[in-house]
Amino acid sequence: MYSAVTRGIEVTVEPFYLEVQSEPEENRYVWGYRVTIVNNSSETVQLCSRYWQITDANGHVQEVRGSGVVGEQPVLDPGASYQYSSGCPLTTSSGVMVGRYQMKGEDGAQFEIEIPAFSLDVPEQRRTLN
């Protein structure tokens, strides 16, 4: 698992290879990832948008921006957590993802929190990208 804390908000990511959905002979590799966001701060916050930077083993970069996550813009009270799962296809057997969430505090001010960098690796070809 990979974890980062920004302003008392912890983001943990657990990636996993989806062998059943992958077709290596067609250069199609698919991973899922489970994200848990825990609000350890003293204020209620809302997740407004997301930004991902996805880099494959050949150095090709894809950027993904969007409103909320999985169709939601969750509100997290102090001590609350939110979890969701999503996926990422690549044309290489490894890659790395990193990103950030745009959050809104109780006063309406927006701020960014870090999504930790995490590697996407085919289990039998495990390697880490920095």
UniProtKB/Swiss-Prot annotation:
| SUPFAM superfamilies referenced in this protein's UniProt entry, alphabetically | ApaG-like
A GO biological process this protein is involved in? Answer: error-free translesion synthesis
Tell me the ranges covered by the ApaG domain, including all copies.
3-127
PROSITE patterns assigned: APAG
| NCBIfam families per the UniProt record, alphabetical | PRK05461.1
Q: What is this protein called in UniProt?
A: Protein ApaG
Q: Provide the gene name from the record.
A: apaG
